[in-house]
Amino acid sequence: CLVGSEMCIRDSHKEGAAASIQIGHCGNMTHYSTAGQIPIGASSGFNLYAYTPVRKMRRDEIMQVSKDFGKAVRTAHAAGFDCVEVHAGHGYLISQFLSPYTNHRRDEYGGSLDNRMRFMRMCLEEVMNAAAATGTSVLVKHNMYDGFKGGIEIPESIEIAREIERWKVNGIVLSGGFVSKAPMAVMRGLIPIYTMSYYSPLWLRAFIRYCGPFMIRQFPFSECYFLEDAKKFREALQLPLIYVGGLVSREGIERALDSGFELVQMARALVNDPAFVNKLREGDAATRSECDHRNYCIARMYSVDMKCCKHCGDLPRKIREELAKLP
């Protein structure tokens, strides 16, 4: 089972909450050191995220990985989770098959949108079969758009969402952005380049500091930054939809719920203040997260633990100086 998850699940159930876990495959964003081999993806190429070549998946590997999604559901259920969230966005493996930016295949898994959805359908079939056998709920995280020219745009994404809906999943989490190409389209806000380089391997630091500002497009933060685009999906779909993206206040959450979304997700607001939801529950209409979206937590999360800079008493001097300069 999943070592270390028992306490989290037990405490969630004790408080009356269901426990969900995200399942997915990084594909071409997998680090060589993690995989122990050249990473696989929808197509061959080079992974700028982990600085390693990528090998196109064979048909037998596609079949095996899709079955592994079903195994992941059964593993999650055995560990005590009530729900799984299939990650089909942000440029991870399912998203790599869906996006024309990363899918250059000339077989039945590439080309037309129907072909590019084939791997996703295979994964969902395995997931839904395992979910039916175990009584596990299923959510799917889905990209509304990739965030750059040549990627998935909203009209095509709505067709993908309709296909997901046909599999009778319990809900879709609407997101956007592509970590290996447009990471800040996912998260928005400031880009702490020095902090990113500080927590990277020594050989990589200079590249990030000097090339990072030119490679990473900035997307300004605004509260509920995905909401207007997400409303287009609300109009097109019947299943429950979950809004995520820039929720930092009671007013923002109410805007999302009043727009027809059944549930909301938050991340950085809770990294900043784990008690944020309880404060909302206490009824203070002015409750607002103190997260300032300087994204220190994002800059360090792939190298060390994810932590808000406001809770780090041992920040290195140069990182403190960088954060102080950010508006």
Outline where the language-model segments fall:
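Single conserved hydrophobic/aromatic residue that forms the stacking wall/gate
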Residues: C1-I9
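Non-globular sequence segments
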Residues: A18, G24-F81
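Aromatic- and acidic-residue-enriched carbohydrate-binding clefts of CAZyme catalytic domains
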Residues: Y32-M57, Q96-N115, I191-M215
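Catalytic cores of alpha/beta
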Residues: P155, A161, L247-E262, M266
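Glycine/Thr-rich beta-alpha phosphate-binding loop at enzyme active sites
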Residues: E163, W167-E235, L239
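Glycine-rich phosphate-binding active-site loops on the catalytic face of alpha/beta enzymes
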Residues: G171, G246, S259-K279
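C-terminal helical cap(s) of enzyme catalytic domains, especially alpha/beta-barrels
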Residues: K181-M196, V271-S289
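Cysteine-cluster motifs in flexible loop/terminal segments that predominantly coordinate metals
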Residues: L280-P327
